[in-house]
From Swiss-Prot:
PROSITE patterns: SAM_DOMAIN (PS50105). The lineage of its organism: Eukaryota, Metazoa, Chordata, Craniata, Vertebrata. Residues 32-41, 490-499, 608-620 have a biased composition (Low complexity). GO terms for molecular function: calcium channel regulator activity; calcium ion binding; channel activator activity; identical protein binding; ion channel regulator activity involved in G protein-coupled receptor signaling pathway; microtubule plus-end binding. The modification Phosphoserine is found at residues 257, 512, 519, 521, 523-524, 567, 575, 602, 608, 618, 621, 628, 660, 668. Keywords: Calcium, Calcium transport, Cell membrane, Coiled coil, Cytoplasm, Cytoskeleton, Endoplasmic reticulum, Glycoprotein, Ion transport, Membrane, Metal-binding, Microtubule, Phosphoprotein, Sarcoplasmic reticulum, Signal, Transmembrane, Transmembrane helix, Transport. Residues 23-213 are extracellular. Residues 655-666 have a biased composition (Acidic residues). Monomer in the presence of Ca(2+). It oligomerizes in absence of Ca(2+). Forms homooligomers and heterooligomers with STIM2. Interacts with pore-forming subunits of CRAC channels, ORAI1, ORAI2 and ORAI3; this interaction is potentiated upon Ca(2+) store depletion. Interacts (via the transmembrane region and the SOAR/CAD domain) with SPPL3; the interaction promotes the binding of STIM1 to ORAI1. Interacts with ORAI1. Interacts with MAPRE1; probably required for targeting to the growing microtubule plus ends. It comes from Mus musculus. This is Stromal interaction molecule 1. One of its GO terms (biological process) is ligand-gated ion channel signaling pathway. Residues 248-442 form a coiled coil. The gene is Stim1.
Length: 685
């Protein structure tokens, strides 16, 4: 306890001693400063009255002027009474700690490079801060100096803008005693802010605070809106580009498809040419076979004429007649099924010329579509190049190039679709025309040859046919694979199959008279129906009529004497299909007759042919349904009663003809017959 008391006494004594020394030192300073201060105050007052005489009697203004003078002294290092540019720059950098004092330097000097005390005072008086009210000073203290805790002190002292220079100088009495600022950092901060305000005017933050806030908000809104707009435009441009790329890919696929169709078209044309060559070879082969059949018929004719067996000749003639009838029946059916009308040769050339002219217009339309496709491709490539640049996406998004390219692509695609549809319709139409006319139209010698063949003025045709350039195609033509089939290529398999069938089918033998009558009635019905649709070619019908008009319908001796295979062969037309069927049947019938002649050599050479004819038509025939003609017995009696065989044969032949006519008119009275006209007897004019 004693130790603590002693320590407290020693501390108290030391404090009192230190306080006494400081008081004595301050008293001495006051005495010396009072004498020097009196002289400085007199000089300051005289200078202030010289500079601003109306305000020299105001104590507050004197204090403010003295503060401005002290600020000038701080800046004037060489003490020559003027502050030059270097001195002000050094003061701003060292005392005010401005790293880039360019703006402040220009504001302080303006156009005057030397600043005196008078210039500095006048600049202070013209400043906006000089006229600040108490509220404005307090606002400056809160917002700029950021010392709101001294607001009450400033309000009590009623400090206005006139007192600002006193705050800008180091004054312990003003800051410590009057303002009661105990914190040294607060005093230094207040001094620096006040010095900046006195020298350079009010701070910009205080003067334009709300405006800057508003501009900042507006800038933020504009920035956010711009970013959002850029994002929307970027997404829209990407979607548009994707759509355009899809259209472009579809256009490429259409081009490839059109190219494939063109290749298939060329391939089909090559097949057409091959089929045409095969057809020519087949016709040549059929003509050779016809010539062989003619030679064989001539040989059989000579053989039949040289035999002395009358009965075998009669039977041979009947078989020959049956085969000829069957061959003519088949030939007529073949005629009905394969030929109805033959167009003239000039029509083929005119149709070929029409096709070539249409191809010219089609090529022009196709070239226009290709040109539109090329323009669309170039536009797409330009957009791709623009997107690779820095602002390419924004430029593409704000310009109308995307819409233009999209429109060009759609236009090109529509043009390609029209070209494809025109190609499809043209192929189908000319295919049907070829089928109906029966000759080639698409494959032709060319427009120049056709113009020369038809004796047309070349100036009527205009420009020459453009060569088809690089052919393109749409997505819709893949269904045309089966449509590019030539009519001749479709007809040639049936032609070959029919020829093959005629070469391999078994030859018909001798049939019953009932079957022949039934077949005649059915073929006549079929012929009557088909004649209404397709008329028979005149040359083939005329040849068949001439061949059949030379024979009777029941095969009497008149056929043997007047009609023979050689004459029938000569009267038949040159059609390979019809003539081949006829001569194959004829050849087969003649072979059978020849074999029968060899099997029956016992018949006497002078035998009456009436016996053979009556035997072939008598009830003892192998077919029980064969009708017996009325004139058979008459022929037998006539042959027995007469001594001249030729007269008896002629008489029996006439009676047999009458009997056959009566049989055809009287048999089957309940059924209506439609006999073929080639089996009718020729009318005598």
């Amino acid at each position: 306890m004693d130790v603590c008391a002693r320590l407290a006494l020693w501390l108290l004594w030391g404090l009192l001693l230190h306080q006494g020394q400081s008081l004595s030192h301050s008293h001495s300073e006051k005495n010396t400063g009072a004498s020097s201060g009196a002289t400085s105050e007199e000089s300051t007052e005289a200078e202030f009255c010289r500079i601003d005489k109306p305000l020299c009697h105001s104590e507050d203004e004197k204090l403010s002027f003295e503060a401005v003078r002290n600020i000038h002294k701080l800046m004037d290092d060489d003490a020559n009474g003027d502050v030059d540019v270097e001195e002000s720059d050094e003061f701003l950098r060292e005392d005010l700690n401005y790293h880039d004092p360019t703006v402040k330097h220009s504001t302080f000097h303006g156009e005057d490079k030397l600043i005196s005390v008078e210039d500095l005072w006048k600049a202070w008086k013209s400043s906006e801060v000089y006229n600040w009210t108490v509220d404005e000073v307090i606002q400056w203290l809160i917002t700029y100096v950021e010392l709101p805790q001294y607001e009450e002190t400033f309000r009590k002292l009623q400090l206005t803008g006139h007192a600002m220079p006193r705050l800008a100088v180091t004054n312990t009495t003003m800051t410590g005693t009057v303002l009661k600022m105990t914190d040294r950092s607060h005093r230094q901060k207040l001094q620096l802010k006040a010095l900046d305000t006195v020298l350079f005017g009010p701070p910009l933050l205080t003067r334009h605070n709300h405006l800057k806030d508003f501009m900042l908000v507006v800038s933020i809104v504009i920035g956010v809106g711009g970013c959002w707009f850029a994002y929307i435009q970027n997404r829209y441009s990407k979607e548009h580009m994707k759509k355009m790329m899809k259209d472009l890919e579809g256009l490429h696929r259409a081009e490839q498809s059109l190219h494939d169709l063109q290749e298939r078209l060329h391939k089909a044309q090559e097949e057409h040419r091959t089929v045409e060559v095969e057809k020519v070879h087949l016709e040549k082969k059929l003509r050779d076979e016809i010539n062989l059949a003619k030679q064989e018929a001539q040989r059989l004719k000579e053989l039949r004429e040289g035999t002395e067996n009358e009965r075998s000749r009669q039977k041979y003639a009947e078989e020959e007649l049956e085969q000829v009838r069957e061959a003519l029946r088949k030939a007529e059916k073949e005629l009905e099924s394969h030929s109805s009308w033959y167009a003239p040769e000039a029509l083929q050339k005119w149709l070929q010329l029409t096709h070539e002219v249409e191809v010219q217009y089609y090529n022009i339309k196709k070239q226009n579509a290709e040109r539109q496709l090329l323009v669309a491709k170039e536009g797409a490539e330009k957009i791709k190049k623009k997107r690779n640049t820095l602002f390419g996406t924004f430029h593409v998004a704000h310009s109308s190039s995307l819409d233009d390219v999209d429109h060009k692509i759609l236009t090109a695609k529509q043009a390609l679709s029209e070209v494809t549809a025109a190609l499809r319709e043209r192929l189908h139409r000319w295919q049907q025309i070829e089928i109906l006319c029966g000759f080639q139209i698409v494959n032709n010698p060319g427009i120049h040859s056709l113009v020369a063949a038809l004796n047309i003025d070349p100036s009527w045709m205009g420009s020459t046919r453009p060569n088809p350039a690089h052919f393109i195609m749409t997505d819709d033509v893949d269904d045309m694979d089966e449509e590019i089939v030539s009519p001749l290529s479709m007809q040639s398999p049936s032609l070959q199959s029919s020829v093959r069938q005629r070469l391999t089918e078994p030859q018909l033998g001798l049939g019953s008279q009932r079957d022949l009558t039934h077949s005649d009635s059915e073929s006549s019905l079929h012929m009557s129906d088909r004649q209404r649709v397709a008329p028979k070619p005149p040359q083939m019908g005329r040849a068949a009529d001439e061949a059949l008009n030379a024979m009777p319908s029941n095969g009497s001796h008149r056929l043997i004497e007047g009609v023979h295979p050689g004459s029938l062969v000569e009267k038949l037309p040159d059609s390979p299909a019809l003539a081949k069927k006829t001569f194959m049947a004829l050849n087969h019938g003649l072979d059978k007759a020849h074999s029968l002649m060899e099997l029956n050599p016992s018949v006497p050479p002078g035998g009456s042919p009436l016996l053979d004819s009556s035997h072939s038509l008598s009830p003892s025939s192998p077919d029980p349904d064969t009708p017996s003609p009325v004139g058979d017995n008459r022929a037998l009696q006539g042959s027995r009663n007469t001594r001249i065989p030729h007269l008896a044969g002629k008489k029996a032949m006439a009676e047999e003809d009458n009997g056959s006519i009566g049989e055809e008119t009287d048999s089957s009275p309940g059924r209506k017959k439609f006999p073929l006209k080639i089996f009718k007897k020729p009318l005598k004019k």
